[in-house]
Amino acid sequence: MEYILIFISAIFVNNIILSQFLGICPFLGVSKKIDTSLGMSAAVAFVMTLATIVTWLVQTYVLNAFGLEYLQTIAFILVIASLVQMVEIILKKVSPALYQALGIFLPLITTNCAVLGVAILVIQKDFNLLQSVVYAFSTAIGFGLALTVFAGMREQLELVNIPKGMRGMAIVMLSAGLLSLAFMGFSGVDSGLKVLFGLD
């Protein structure tokens, strides 16, 4: 039940973009088309989950073991950058078609603060490895959900006549705010589930 709570909370209640405001750059920059947002979401899900596993292991068995906790941020950035490069090389060799589809998104993931944020959050929350994997994957799903829904909103906005003063970034920010308000409706769901299943 604890894992279900982590899953629901990471996707809806504490959405990485709409509640914690991490990953705003791809949220605004890659959300013009649903196709590109789905590609970015898939790439982020893969890298975020893999990076969280590796950074958790590095934190637990290297940084904590040798008293090097102060190197956490630098170590995590190096791990994420290395993983992205490794994934890019493997995809290029194994599946050129998938590499072509995701190739433009992979370099962007290195600078996506959501990936680093999740790696640090699992350490701060003192999650074990399995909890960390569930949290990272759930957060990636929440990232993809927010990105794809927002891309759908932006595609619909292209079809309507928007007043001149509201065009461009103004309507984008207003739409992002409305989407964030919609996700606020999920606040309290995790608390309700804890009470319902006696986990509080």
Where are the language model's segments positioned?
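Juxtamembrane boundary at the C-terminal end of a transmembrane helix
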Residues: 2, 182-200
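Structural signature of hydrophobic alpha-helical transmembrane segments
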Residues: 3-18, 67-82, 134-146
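Hydrophobic core segments of alpha-helical transmembrane domains in multi-pass membrane transport
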Residues: 6, 13, 44, 49, ...
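Generic transmembrane alpha-helix signature in multi-pass membrane proteins
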Residues: 21-29, 88-94, 103-106, 113-126
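C-terminal ends of transmembrane helices
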Residues: 22-36, 84-98, 150-161
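Cytoplasmic-side transmembrane-helix entry/capping segments in multi-pass membrane proteins
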Residues: 35-46, 70-76, 98-109, 165-170
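Ordered, amphipathic secondary-structure segments that act as subunit-interaction surfaces
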Residues: 60-103
